[in-house]
């Protein structure tokens, strides 16, 4: 299920990033009292009343002073966010009258046809603030807020959530594996999807996806069922067409949310880019199974060491994803493409692996005996017991005498031991450390 998207827009210096940080639960966007600090779109997940959603912070939109390249770029970024959004929060400064930029932005938002909530920010005295001037923007009743102090944010979120589309449950066989093919533009996503589908004799159907403008292709292979979520097949609209690279990140994130296994495509000729890192990081945090697929391998001049060098470079650039298997392919020629589905099956199984509690604790005792935790000011960490509490991704709780004694290096040691004993190849592992009450030890 794809999460709704909420875009925060407005002219510069009205408090968009402060509101974004308030909703994201921490300091994510840089907040300074000058225009133009947020130039690119920032994405974070949030939740209200049990509804999860993605929020986007954008740079300020200016129409009056739009002659600089940076101003034009920031405006384009905001236009992309509007295109992506299910709900738009238009932030205005309640301490001054509407400006010409406010009027122009309001016109743009009305034409979008999206639900728009007018958030009147910087309200310090709710009893005395007059907001009647802002009704002229034609966007309904303003919601007075103070993003800095967190005042009335709950009312704003109530209004936001009320506009979310209803959840639509997809009727899909639980044994069906959903595969998201993600990556930058021109990396070969469409070619890979077409090659995979073209090699299969039984293409069951095309299923309209819950993600806007996506077409999911369902097919069978050796009696197993798959759905490919094809981000490359999405339509691009109007002025957004020229901004395919920026827009592709959002499409990829939505596909990640709905998938079981991700095929992360990299261009053999370009290596790992910053955008690749962003998409890979989102996949890692989402707990999805992942395969790193290096495409266009047929175009690379190589010797017997080229593949090893390339894989080493990938591991250095994506250090947080050492667990992901790598496959070098050519979607154009079909080189090694037939191996992909076997690897997808394997990674999906690894991401769903369960470990019996008795087996786990026997091994945990051995690991601690072989490598006892270091002492900290005379105190030593005691790992009392562990249990697995979830899959997709495999999630483990370690009960200890004092969670503050669990150093990140020892946590990494335990994760490495889990992988050595049980595999989990292609799958992230979640580790939760909880402190056991002294009297219950």
From Swiss-Prot:
Signal peptide: none annotated. Transmembrane segments: none annotated. InterPro entries: AAA+_ATPase, G_ENGA, GTP-bd, GTPase_Der, KH_dom-like, KH_dom-like_a/b, P-loop_NTPase, Small_GTP-bd. GO terms for molecular function: ATP hydrolysis activity; GTP binding; ribosome binding. Keywords: GTP-binding, Nucleotide-binding, Repeat, Ribosome biogenesis. GO terms for biological process: ribosome biogenesis. It comes from Desulfitobacterium hafniense (strain Y51). Residues 353-437 form the KH-like domain. The keyword GTP-binding applies. This is GTPase Der. It comes from the Bacteria. The gene is der. Associates with the 50S ribosomal subunit. GTP 1 binds at residues 10-17, 57-61, 121-124. Residues 4-168, 177-352 form the EngA-type G domain. Belongs to the TRAFAC class TrmE-Era-EngA-EngB-Septin-like GTPase superfamily. EngA (Der) GTPase family. GTPase that plays an essential role in the late steps of ribosome biogenesis. GTP 2 binds at residues 183-190, 230-234, 295-298. Coiled coil: none annotated.
